[in-house]
């Protein structure tokens, strides 16, 4: 299985320097520290997905760097949204939703006023625009929406679906992708005069690449899980040997045999383990192995389901 760099780590100086971002993004990193933990993590995830989408789309390194920073700043306007709305545990009322939508224009104004943020205003301003004209804040059409915003929109929608917000129910990866794919199809709510009756909200080409990015992420998770399962298998084999020696020790009647098997048991036990709590240790290892095997099966099935999706 190919090696995959899964996460764009904004706090790893080595990784930042490889993209020449260590100086340009340090200011933005400090600025977003003021956001609540969910929004900050969401911005990081959207930036990571955006970076990977740009790679899949074979965009230039310069544009990828620019687009990644735009994505990281896309929700910067939420600095000005009341926490009572931003962190509300229940679904927003229509009035609250209208206030929440203002984060796009608020983010735009913040970026325009700040010379260090100004180059990246497009992420904040346009990431909720839709190709069919049903987005906000301006209701722009396909050709008027910057390409970076089209990419960020898809990344933002995916992360918002798979990572549970306070007022939303978590859904699975495949179901999230189905929703995003559905949003590539024409909407009944699209303005009739737009001339884009065949366009959906999302760019099909970008959504196709999203499927590839998600599969890469799952394959990375599989590779990590396989390593852990292999370690568990080795440990269970060790524990099986201990169990065999314990059984033989318990069935032995001669003192020398009891001592002999006891010595082998002591050699196989790890620091912190003892023969007295062996049953619990053995059971916990078996349970962990079964759990990880089930996770692996689920991940493999997830990839199969994603590959069956059609755009």
Residue ranges of model-derived segments:
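Histidine- and acidic-residue-rich, metal-dependent catalytic cores
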Residues: 2-310
